[in-house]
């Protein structure tokens, strides 16, 4: 029997901490949220366990752009220093211990710390950047390596700890823990109120999350609430209450029941750079999923799936990110299949394949970042962010399902998530796990051992394309083909062409139009927008593609709505392709638009847009 590869104690290259000497087991975060200073001020207390038998007299934690005031170890002042900054990983905090610590003994490290204006994990919004314009707002985004910019920590997904949060703010607070019911505390002299949260399931640092602003909540299921600006509460409640509990029950039947207690969704202001962030208990989500037609809630199916894949069973480093995102994309599509039927799973996978092709073309098919297992030594994991870990990861897991058969693979799924529950793993442990599980099934064992694992893990570019059920895309391809040859045919577009199509089918239609060797003329593009009502669509998944069709067609009338949209949404899925297309249309307009809106964007998004537009030198 093949044995699992032993874990390398330093298998995460994107941390400077000595987490092979000490391991965080619990963290208490105590912060005052100061909107006037755009700072978090307070302290963090780590309980650390010694992994060696008195071999180390120092604790090294990740930190980045922090103001450290003091450090105590077991209640006594300790010597400490911030080491020189090492890009892109920050300035390690070295804490000296008076004596080495015996194996398994615990120490308590208390660090007084403030965030600074250079913090890459927090975005502070002025009232005018929120939907109702009444109050300021702040939120965190710690994935991949930004928790170290909020407090010193072992900022690696290879370490998991329980958390408690003690936070004070003049505005309501959300955090990635279960709210602790408490007597209403009177406002402090500063006008702030205390909020407490507990996370009893151990989580990695990148799942630490806080937000504060003008936030109201409404129930969307028996264990779920939506939290959002009060002016958007009713529309968000309607958008999410139809599917959230159904998603939770569906995936619970595939793996095992949900373990986190509550599942809630925080709808953030529009500058949030991602579709969703799977922070435990409270998914942080983009307002772009609120399309007023319940057609964009696949994001919620994805984030709910992370409650098992990523949050409970975690990649040990960002080099193995596909273990988080490939599995989650696979599970999201299993939810879709259970609810909408198997053809819809294939339809979603066809859309995903297109995104994978786009990412590989953009990077180049020999690029390191098109591999399933990537080398991130000395690199910023944010730079590797693309659809590759999602869609190449999905394709691999889908291939495994088809290789050994769905019924057999379905028995492996709960085994895998039970085996690594609460743990972090790498790709080689995953391989060993599935080989071990099917060791007594001769047919499956032979197939899995014949599989070219090295090609799947390390070969750049596109993997073999699966055989998909195309029934839901064939009608769309046919319509796109009519538009492709519209000048040479009698085809007369009508609004009824869209009858019976869901939003994702319209997305595929527009993606096909964008692939035309000969773009539409400006007149044809405008006519498409009018007859199909794309120009007025409230669904951003549709409108951002239609704007690209117009820009490729050279339609000047599209420029103004493109600039407008780029100032209203900060989700990278939309703004990065739009800027690329706008730059090809008119680079000066693209650069001017970025300069106008750059302070609206989240620091992660802003940094990647600078690289897209100006190269590695930035603006």
From Swiss-Prot:
It comes from the Eukaryota. Binds 1 zinc ion per subunit. Its cofactor is Zn(2+). The keyword Heme does not apply. PANTHER family: LEUKOTRIENE A-4 HYDROLASE (PTHR45726:SF3). Aminopeptidase that preferentially cleaves di- and tripeptides. Also has low epoxide hydrolase activity (in vitro). Can hydrolyze the epoxide leukotriene LTA(4) but it forms preferentially 5,6-dihydroxy-7,9,11,14-eicosatetraenoic acid rather than the cytokine leukotriene B(4) as the product compared to the homologous mammalian enzyme (in vitro). This is Leucine aminopeptidase 2. The lineage of its organism: Eukaryota, Fungi, Dikarya, Ascomycota, Pezizomycotina.
């Amino acid at each position: 029997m093949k044995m699992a590869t032993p874990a390398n104690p330093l298998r995460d290259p994107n941390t400077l901490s000595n987490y092979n000497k000490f391991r965080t087991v619990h963290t208490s975060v105590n912060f005052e949220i100061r909107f006037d200073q755009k700072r978090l001020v307070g302290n963090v207390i780590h309980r650390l366990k010694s992994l060696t038998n008195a071999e180390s007299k120092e604790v090294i934690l990740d930190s980045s752009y922090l103001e450290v005031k003091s450090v105590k170890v077991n209640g006594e002042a300790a010597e400490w220093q911030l080491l020189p900054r090492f890009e892109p990983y920050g300035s390690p905090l070295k804490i000296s211990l008076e004596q080495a610590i015996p194996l398994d003994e615990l120490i308590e490290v208390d660090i007084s710390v403030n965030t600074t204006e250079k913090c890459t994990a927090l975005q502070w919004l002025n009232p005018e950047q929120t939907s109702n314009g009444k109050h300021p707002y702040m939120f965190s985004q710690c994935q991949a390596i930004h928790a170290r910019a909020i407090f010193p920590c072992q900022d690696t997904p290879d370490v998991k700890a329980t958390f408690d949060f003690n936070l004070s703010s003049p505005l309501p607070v959300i955090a990635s823990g279960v709210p602790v019911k408490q007597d209403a505390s009177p406002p402090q002299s500063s006008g702030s109120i205390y909020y407490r949260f507990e996370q009893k399931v151990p989580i990695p640092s990148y799942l630490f999350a806080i937000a504060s602003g003008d936030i109201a909540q409404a129930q969307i299921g028996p264990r779920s609430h939506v939290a959002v600006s009060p002016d958007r509460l009713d529309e968000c409640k309607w958008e999410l209450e139809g599917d959230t509990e159904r998603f939770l029950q569906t995936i619970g039947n595939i793996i095992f029941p949900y373990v986190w207690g509550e599942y809630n969704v925080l709808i953030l202001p529009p500058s949030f750079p991602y579709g969703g962030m799977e922070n435990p208990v409270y998914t942080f989500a983009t307002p772009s999923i609120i399309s007023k037609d319940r057609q964009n809630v696949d994001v919620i199916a994805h984030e709910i799936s992370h409650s098992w894949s990523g949050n409970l069973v975690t990649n040990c480093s960002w080099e193995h990110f596909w273990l988080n995102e490939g599995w989650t994309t696979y599970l999201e599509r299993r939810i879709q299949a259970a609810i909408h039927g198997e053809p819809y799973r294939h339809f979603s996978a066809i859309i995903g394949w297109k995104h994978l092709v786009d990412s590989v073309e953009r990077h180049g098919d020999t690029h390191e970042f098109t591999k399933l297992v990537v080398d991130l030594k000395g690199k910023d994991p944010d730079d590797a962010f693309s659809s590759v870990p999602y869609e190449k990861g999905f394709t691999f897991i889908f291939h495994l399902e088809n290789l050994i058969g769905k019924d057999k693979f379905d028995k492996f799924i709960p085994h895998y998530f039970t085996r690594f529950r609460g743990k972090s793993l790498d790709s080689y442990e995953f391989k060993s796990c599935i080989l071990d599980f099917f060791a007594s099934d001769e047919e499956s064992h032979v197939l899995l051992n014949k599989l070219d694992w090295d090609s799947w893990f390390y070969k750049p570019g596109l993997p073999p394309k699966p055989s998909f059920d195309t029934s839901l895309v064939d009608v769309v391809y046919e319509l796109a083909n009519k538009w492709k040859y519209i000048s040479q045919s009698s085809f007369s577009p009508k609004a009824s062409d869209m009858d019976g199509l869901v939003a994702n089918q319209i997305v595929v239609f527009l993606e096909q139009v964008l692939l035309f060797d000969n773009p539409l003329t400006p007149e044809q593009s405008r006519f498409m927008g009018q007859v199909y009502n794309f120009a007025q669509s409230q669904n951003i998944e549709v409108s951002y593609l239609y704007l690209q069709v117009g820009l490729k067609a050279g339609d000047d009338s599209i420029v103004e709505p493109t600039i407008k949209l780029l100032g209203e949404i900060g989700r990278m899925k939309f703004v990065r392709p739009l800027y690329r297309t706008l730059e090809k249309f008119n680079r000066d307009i693209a650069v001017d638009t970025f300069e106008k809106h750059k302070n609206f964007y989240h620091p992660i998004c802003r940094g990647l847009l600078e690289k897209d537009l100006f190269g590695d030198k930035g603006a």
